[in-house]
Amino acid sequence: MVNTMKTKLLCVLLLCGAVFSLPRQETYRQLARGSRAYGVACRDEKTQMIYQQQESWLRPEVRSKRVEHCRCDRGLAQCHTVPVKSCSELRCFNGGTCWQAASFSDFVCQCPKGYTGKQCEVDTHATCYKDQGVTYRGTWSTSESGAQCINWNSNLLTRRTYNGRRSDAITLGLGNHNYCRNPDNNSKPWCYVIKASKFILEFCSVPVCSKATCGLRKYKEPQLHSTGGLFTDITSHPWQAAIFAQNRRSSGERFLCGGILISSCWVLTAAHCFQERYPPQHLRVVLGRTYRVKPGKEEQTFEVEKCIVHEEFDDDTYNNDIALLQLKSGSPQCAQESDSVRAICLPEANLQLPDWTECELSGYGKHKSSSPFYSEQLKEGHVRLYPSSRCTSKFLFNKTVTNNMLCAGDTRSGEIYPNVHDACQGDSGGPLVCMNDNHMTLLGIISWGVGCGEKDIPGVYTKVTNYLGWIRDNMRP
């Protein structure tokens, strides 16, 4: 009888142990059930895209011009050939051919070699990312921990801020795939992964490109001198932008200010250029132009999506004299890199170059303050960074100088150098760049000065290192 009781007690204890171990297994089973519920979706074996129950799509036949219409039915793709016609508007990127179903509005892109995705937006040859990877459109899909990324279109991400069903998903690089992206201007590409039954954000293991191209150029030694500087070619300053504004009371447009290309779709400039508060649709940005109004062979022109002026800009002292223009484009890429068009490198937050470091400025501004017109050709000037002790009101006729400003000027003197290099009216918003780690790097934005080319009086520039956070925050989608 005692042995029987012991046996029953042992069975009860074993049963209790099994019951108490259930929560861990149940968690796993919940995850497995979720996977099975997700499994009623369809995976297109040709494109590897995932579609939900009853969702339909078009797909091209790889070896023919036929197009199939497919529908997800209980986890299986049911497909049949449908007649198509050319799309009425441009929908495919990177040279893709667009076909639209004859009887309904859906479309499909036949992508050239090296590209895939709904709109040929995925670059299968992209093996690394540049800068922070905001424009990375490759196929890397593994996080730094080795986990596989979740498809951005997954129902599991519906309540997340960034998913493939956002209205601006294609612009952010999101869609029906699980490739690493950086839609929020983070420090590098990332994705969502499953860890301990939770969805978390993890950075990806995609490598950074070994050599950044920002700040590189094919410098041409200037041959002609001009008052205030030297005539130059755009290939010597490929980050230089020209900003134009529509005339308010007449047709046409006028040159407004200079600007600086800092990424494919963003131009940095001076806030004081927009004191008249031009709406974005009245602005135009030209890149790759040597002559101010004469079109160049390799120039690129863009309308403006956004004009962001620093919220604390002081139009009296010119403190916080900084603004951002977002270029308008139908794709994630705006400016195409070339010898004439290339972004400048932004500085590290702690970058401090030695006093009297030689730097360069460029712009289409006046030759001197009394000139009636702006320069017809791009000019460059060579100036040196002034010590902070020489960048004060005392040396600038009691004008206000804040910690958000820096000074630079031409320190050459004597009869050999009668032409003092300096910025002037019309150069505003342009760059002050210096060599750092073999790349030209943006130190300042041309802001204000006392006259133009006055001996021993420096020009004043917006100190870019003070605004890296502001730039980053405002470039976020």
UniProtKB/Swiss-Prot annotation:
Glycosylation sites: N185, N398
Residue stretches making up the Peptidase S1 domain: 226-476
Active site (record annotation): H272, D321, S428
Leader sequence segment: 1-36
Record lineage: Eukaryota, Metazoa, Chordata, Craniata, Vertebrata
Keyword set, alphabetical order: Disulfide bond, EGF-like domain, Glycoprotein, Hydrolase, Kringle, Plasminogen activation, Protease, Secreted, Serine protease, Signal
Disulphide linkage map: C42-C72, C70-C79, C87-C98, C92-C109, C111-C120, C128-C209, C149-C191, C180-C204, C214-C345, C257-C273, C265-C334, C359-C434, C391-C407, C424-C452
Domain of life: Eukaryota
This protein's domain notes: The fibronectin type-I domain mediates binding to fibrin, and the kringle domain apparently mediates fibrin-induced stimulation of activity.
Primary subcellular site in the record, as a coarse category: secreted
Domain EGF-like: 83-121
Protein's recorded name: Salivary plasminogen activator alpha 2
PANTHER family: TISSUE-TYPE PLASMINOGEN ACTIVATOR, TRYPSIN-RELATED
Functional description taken from the UniProt entry: Probably essential to support the feeding habits of this exclusively haematophagous animal. Probable potent thrombolytic agent.
Catalytic activity entry: Specific cleavage of Arg-|-Val bond in plasminogen to form plasmin
Subunit structure of this chain's protein: Monomer.
